[in-house]
């Protein structure tokens, strides 16, 4: 430092974030906040956050958490408490996902944390991952942050927003490691038929890809459609299936999600070691929220009232469609 001259050190963001975008929160939301300050009325459809819109969790879930708070003050196993993982394992069985043990279940502070964990454990710089377009932005953001190259495949509006199978096939290269599906889809709402899922499973089988299946909306299916978990159709393909309680039980703020490993786990031993390492580094997901999983999955499913004719979600969906 020369006499009379002061050099001030400044800090910028990491270059790792240069190409990372997350529009659920970020510049778009900042601009919406500015517009609100200017007096404009903003309808916020950027995030699935039920509570501010008047949706509440089933009372028994709230009471169950309150009754478990005192015994939930310590860390749990990195994968989660036994009762939560047991309930999730049984849920997987009901969904037809074969060969799942309690050790294949990981709880997380929402599915978002687990998606980020999976991308960090899998991708080396330049590895490719197939992600639907349009997508839920977290998938692209976390894969990019992990050093991966995101390759978007088309979900065609003219074909009920189903994945374009030929487009998927055309975009696979020797560096492709995995394919992501979001089913039911966010943001399109499409529920994929079994035939589409089987074709995606065939592609993953042929090219030895991991399937990541984001199924957080699996219990919000209307009009007689049936949700099928792709892992139930691909017992020989390594699958990671994500779900949680944020949407179905209206408790996004509690931050409780999970992932289920199934299929050809013997082909992913090194990857699973990486998942275990990163899971251990964050110690555990929040224990009070874990304590309600058993009650939430086994008890009264209030979401069913909302998605039947006359229910709020059903009627609002129809109203918006008519507009």
Can you name each region flagged by the protein language model?
Residues 1-7:
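Short, Lys/Arg-enriched N-terminal segments with co-localized hydrophobic residues
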Residues 9-13, 18-110, 117, 284, ...:
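N-terminal small-domain helix-loop-helix segment of the aminotransferase-like
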Residues 38, 146, 206-207, 237:
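Helix C-cap/helix->beta junction micro-motif
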Residues 99-105, 125-128, 175, 236-239:
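Short acidic capping loops at alpha-helix termini that bridge into adjacent secondary structure
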Residues 121-143:
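Conserved PLP-anchoring active-site segment centered on the Schiff-base-forming lysine
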Residues 145-151:
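A short helix-loop-beta submotif of the ANL/AMP-binding
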Residues 151, 156-226:
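Active-site phosphate-binding strand-loop segment of PLP-dependent enzymes
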Residues 232-311, 321:
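Conserved core segment of the aminotransferase class I/II
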């Amino acid at each position: 430092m020369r006499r009379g001259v002061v050099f001030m050190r400044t800090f910028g963001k990491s270059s790792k974030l240069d190409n990372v975008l997350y529009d659920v929160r970020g510049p778009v939301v900042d601009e919406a906040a500015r517009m609100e300050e200017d007096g404009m009325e903003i309808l916020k459809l950027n995030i699935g956050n039920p509570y501010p819109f008047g949706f509440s969790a089933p009372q028994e879930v709230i009471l169950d958490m309150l009754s478990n708070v005192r015994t939930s003050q310590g860390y749990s196993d990195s994968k989660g408490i036994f009762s939560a993982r047991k309930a999730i394992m049984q849920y997987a069985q009901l969904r037809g996902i074969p060969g799942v043990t309690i050790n294949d279940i990981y709880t997380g502070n929402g599915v978002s944390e687990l998606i980020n964990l999976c991308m960090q454990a899998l991708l080396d710089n330049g590895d490719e991952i197939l992600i639907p377009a349009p997508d839920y932005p977290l998938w692209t953001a976390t894969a990019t942050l992990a050093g991966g190259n995101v390759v978007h495949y088309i979900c065609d509006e003219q074909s009920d927003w189903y994945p374009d199978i030929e487009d998927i096939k055309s975009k696979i290269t020797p560096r492709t490691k995995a394919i992501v599906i979001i089913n039911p889809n966010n943001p399109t709402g499409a529920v994929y038929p079994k035939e589409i899922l089987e074709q995606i499973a065939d592609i993953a089988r042929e090219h030895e890809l991991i399937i990541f299946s984001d199924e957080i909306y699996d219990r919000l299916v209307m009009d007689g459609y049936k949700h099928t978990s792709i892992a139930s159709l691909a017992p020989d393909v390594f699958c990671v299936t994500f779900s949680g309680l944020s949407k179905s039980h209206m408790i996004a703020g509690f931050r409780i999600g999970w992932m289920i490993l199934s299929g050809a786990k013997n082909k992913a031993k090194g990857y699973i070691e990486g998942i275990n390492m990163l899971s251990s580094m964050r110690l555990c997901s929040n224990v009070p929220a874990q304590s309600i999983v058993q009650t939430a999955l086994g008890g009264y499913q209030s979401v069913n009232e909302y998605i039947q004719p006359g229910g709020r979600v059903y009627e609002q969906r129809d109203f918006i469609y008519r507009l």
